[in-house]
Amino acid sequence: MHAYRTHNCGALRASDTGAAVRLSGWIHRKRDHGGLVFIDLRDHYGLTQLVLHPETPGFNVVERLRAESVIRVDGEVIARDASVVNPNLPTGEIEIRVSAVEVLSEAAELPLPVFGEPDYPEEIRLKHRYLDLRRETLHKNIVLRSRVIQSIRNRMFAQGFNEFQTPILTASSPEGARDFLVPSRLHPEKFYALPQAPQQFKQLLMVSGFDRYFQIAPCFRDEDLRADRSLEFYQLDVEMSFVTQEDVFAAIEPVMHGVFEEFSNGKPVSPINGTHTFTNDFGQSFEHKGFERLTYAQSMAWYGSDKPDLRNPIKMANVSEHFRDGGFGLFAKILGADAKNQVWAIPAPTGGSRAFCDRMNSWAQGEGQPGLGYVFWSEDQGGWGGPIAKNLGEPTQALMESLGLGAGDAAFFVAGDPAVFAKFAGLARTRVGTELKLVDENQFKFCWIVDFPMFEWNEEEKKVDFSHNPFSMPQGGLEALETQDPLTIRAYQYDIVCNGYELCSGAIRNHKPEIMLKAFATAGYGPEVVEEQFGGMLNAFRYGAPPHGGLAPGIDRIVMLLADQVAIREVIAFPLNQQGQDLLMNAPANVLDKQLKELHIRTAPPIKV
């Protein structure tokens, strides 16, 4: 017989009745019933109920053991009486009559209970993560993560991709967040950086003649934390040669759809075999298969966000023309003050009560806004109400019809410069959808966001800067960079969004040195800066570079959505807390003076910036 087990704790069934077995595991729960001790024994695979009689050798020892102690038992599989069969447990038809027990490891008093999974402060959970990971929900999340990654790998290999690894110690480069720096002992006063992403290396692989690359890549970014962001994370890093944007979409959509469908527990996933009509910002339309597509401008105008949750059916609308000629004086004044100002409506189907509208107004004030103007429509005499309706009068009916609303509905309004209020309008849309229970949470709704602006105005530095990835190909190429207002240039950049979360960003790359140098010059970076920061890749492009593109879906966020969690820490085995600390390993920590000396480093008090 094996030293520790003949079966795992999730394996035995009624067909095993009468078998002599050996099991090992943790004491999940212990109950004393009339002299008999019942134990739920747990391992990675499941639970099995044990029965110990007073005459069982070691009975007295087991009686005093705490939960989470580790034991080995020998015994016989017996069928449970029909009245005590547990249909919710795979092993619920049997139990083990224990004939011998040995304590393999006795548990001290627990700082964190495992059975029942009661809520506990995150600080305690992270400090004792090895106990937290024994809890069923978190344990399943980590197993799910493993299976999702395996599924992704299989799907990528099936499409002809090869998996390569890229360096962890590399050079610092300005890619949007702060780098984690690693001092070099062999090269005093010089530093490596941990990669924010394998961006340059994966492009260099394409220049090196490889065609379809991927890896499950570790990435490191020294940035402020939030529920869906971590200092270290993993992404499905992808790059392809000789491709257009359409080719990238066609390659990754089956992977994303397939993985979500495989692990969605029956939740519907946006189909990829249907046909959509996409209209770009210039009014040009064409049909395509796959996920729905929105331009960046459309997403901001309709949803107030570049990562819209399309489970919420509310689509905002520009209703400036209803207010431009007066009626509601405040809005007319705002519209007349600046040509770029607009009035947006946030429809609220079924929200046509004064109580709900007042509640939304109070919420807006809590968000630091002066309020939230509204109109609601009813069957009562007059047909409408609210402060805006009183001033607007009869045009209120036309406004209702233009928004596709009717009696029992409402609409909320924001006015001013959309660049300033769009984010708040998006939050209000989300709030309305949630409050009115319009969001269908039982689905995974995907879309592409395309046609991002190549550049944006950096108000702090008073200059044009890159809005996203500086290595993207501008739409229109060199001609656009030389002839267009930089703020009107769009890039071949795209995001995948699911249920309001950005799952990945990607782009068709700028593979021509002359276009790259011009793009960086437009953002205020001279050729010497580009050569210093990106000289390796720029020089490689001078020796024949294929058109290429790629993207990088975030593994942590994918698993977070599939596990129905709201924080990626719930799908990472050993995460940092929101202050960037590892409470289990006590990191970051002080190091020995000897280590600093070897690295030619002297510490100093923090400098206020």
Swiss-Prot record:
UniProt xrefs under CDD domains: AspRS_core, EcAspRS_like_N
Positions bearing the site annotation: Important for tRNA non-discrimination: 33
Residues the record lists as binding L-aspartate: 175, 221, 468, 509
Keyword Protein biosynthesis (UniProt): yes
Key words, A-Z: Aminoacyl-tRNA synthetase, ATP-binding, Cytoplasm, Ligase, Nucleotide-binding, Protein biosynthesis
GO BP terms in the entry: aspartyl-tRNA aminoacylation
Subcellular location: Cytoplasm
Enzyme class: ligase
Methyltransferase as UniProt keyword: no
InterPro entries: Aa-tRNA-synt_II, aa-tRNA-synth_II, aa-tRNA-synth_II/BPL/LPL, Asp-tRNA-ligase_1, Asp-tRNA-ligase_1_N, Asp/Asn-tRNA-synth_IIb, AspRS_core, GAD-like_sf
Quaternary state and interactors: Homodimer.
PANTHER family (alphabetical): ASPARTATE--TRNA LIGASE, MITOCHONDRIAL, ASPARTYL/LYSYL-TRNA SYNTHETASE
Primary role: Aspartyl-tRNA synthetase with relaxed tRNA specificity since it is able to aspartylate not only its cognate tRNA(Asp) but also tRNA(Asn). Reaction proceeds in two steps: L-aspartate is first activated by ATP to form Asp-AMP and then transferred to the acceptor end of tRNA(Asp/Asn).
Name the record gives this protein: Aspartate--tRNA(Asp/Asn) ligase
Organism the protein comes from: Caulobacter vibrioides (strain ATCC 19089 / CIP 103742 / CB 15) (Caulobacter crescentus)
